Amino acid sequence: MKINDFFAYIEEQVADCAKKERALIAENRKDEANMERIKSNVYGIAKSLCQVTEELAKKHGLDHATMFVDKLTAVMAPWKASLTAAKEHTDSEKECIELIKLETADRILEAWKR
């Protein structure tokens, strides 16, 4: 995916999450609204990582695509560890949060690779 298309995808997803969040709040569904906010935050993290890795790749003559995937994967590692801990401690709320973060990051990686 071209970088401008990727940024457009991210912005579209953030806007969609915000729209869903507002609708859920209006329906007094706060927990579900919080999940949309979490997704939006992950998209924001990915956008920031993409911008930073693009600059670093240019500066150091490295492959931007590989660098972005590596950095996003590194960000996901603590989420995976937290998910494992949540499962071990039967913390269903934390488990749900970590799953949403990881699923969103996986969607981002899939979009990036298109």
Model-derived segments and their meaning:
Residues 1, 49-70:
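Intrinsic disorder/low-complexity detector
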